Regions:
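Conserved beta-strand hairpin/beta-sheet module of binuclear metal-dependent hydrolase folds
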Residues: 24, 33, 39-87, 168-186, ...
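Structured catalytic core of nucleotide-sugar glycosyltransferases
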Residues: 49-59, 102-110, 128, 158-159
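Active-site neighborhood of phospho(di)ester-bond hydrolases with catalytic His/Asp-centered motifs
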Residues: 71-74, 95-102, 123-125, 182-185, ...
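Active-site metal-binding motif and surrounding structural segment of the metallo-beta-lactamase
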Residues: 76-123
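Active-site environment of divalent metal-dependent phosphoester hydrolases
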Residues: 103-107, 129-130, 166, 190-192, ...
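Metallo-beta-lactamase
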Residues: 123-178
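Cap/insert and terminal regions of metallo-dependent hydrolase folds
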Residues: 192-290
Length: 311
């Protein structure tokens, strides 16, 4: 018997969401029925799987039944492949790697991964220059507010966001059939373009980097505190809550909070502050993407529970 995940919000902390679909839990022993099958073969929609998020590495798998795109590749190549294996995803099935900016925790093994897996590598020109990647030969560069098209109808829109000296972008992914997901980390504030695009999403993964009071009381030097909390730094729990309150709508089904600082934040603080800001009108789920991932405990299906996806 399948159970809707929304009724068991705190039972299992899995971090795979299927935009536009109902999410189900299923007994662990049932997994043997689907051993060796890619979970994307069983769904029609947009899958978002966080392989891990934080200052030591970031990677998010965006999938449809016909396409796998890795947004950021900040872990070592070995770690990334190990995390994909936990998700039962063959690295050679990755069609593309999209890098949001040049910082190592987002781009570290992207070039090696794209070459080994035969996946195309996409980034903006600023990222390519800072990483020393050769446009055309090694990567395809994109501009701001440019749509990237991938196999099977998946597309991604690149939204420029402010973060330190990097040319960072947020990603709005679409499956071409109405399901949309926003992936946004490493920014000091939300731009109007970003807010506009997030307002149409069914799923949002967004950073909630620090608790303001913890940052002020913490051991960081004042210069670093100012950088983190500045326009080009990171989003606080409060800022993230305000953004989600503004963009929340009846179609928003799930939120994942990412890139939490281990020194200046805590999962329960981030979750409670965001939920308080979003209010009772939001009926979806809020979860945390941890540094050590992925945590795969969810099954997802379409309208008929018999169409399952292994996670």
């Amino acid at each position: 018997m399948l159970m809707e995940r929304s009724s068991y919000k705190n039972l299992l902390p899995g971090l795979t969401y299927y935009v536009g679909l109902k999410i189900y839990l299923c007994p662990v022993e049932t997994m043997d029925l689907f051993k060796g099958r890619c979970w994307a073969d069983w769904i029609m929609g947009l899958g978002i799987t966080h392989l891990g998020s934080g200052s030591r590495g970031n990677a998010t798998l965006i999938s449809t039944e016909n396409c796998n795109v890795l947004v950021d590749c900040g872990f070592s190549l070995k770690q990334t492949e190990n995390r994909l294996a936990i998700a039962d995803v063959d690295p050679n099935s990755i069609d593309a790697v999209v890098v949001t900016h040049h910082h190592k925790d987002h781009s570290g093994s992207a070039l090696r991964a794209s070459k080994k897996w035969g996946a195309s590598l996409h980034c903006n020109l600023g990222t390519a220059i800072r990483r020393g990647w050769r446009p055309i030969e090694e990567c395809t560069t994109f501009g701001n507010l440019e749509r990237l098209d991938f196999p099977g109808g998946m597309s991604m829109l690149t939204i420029p966001v402010p973060h330190d000296d990097s040319d960072n972008v947020g990603i709005i992914a679409s499956d071409g059939r109405g399901s949309r997901a926003g992936i946004v980390t490493d920014l000091g504030e939300a731009t109007r373009d970003l807010v506009k695009q997030l307002s149409g999403c069914n799923h949002i993964s967004i950073e909630a980097n620090y608790d303001h009071s913890r940052l002020l009381r913490g051991p960081y030097p004042d210069s670093l505190k100012r950088r983190i909390s500045g326009r080009g730094g990171h989003l606080s729990n409060f800022q993230t809550g305000q953004i989600l309150q503004e963009v929340s709508n009846k179609n928003l089904q799930s939120v994942v909070l990412c890139h939490l600082s281990e020194s200046n934040n805590a999962p329960h603080i981030a979750e409670s502050e965001v939920l308080l800001a979003m209010g009772d009108e939001f009926e979806g789920s809020v979860s945390i993407s941890k540094q050590k991932g992925p945590e795969f405990t969810h099954w997802a299906g379409v309208e008929e529970p018999s169409k399952l996806a292994i996670v």
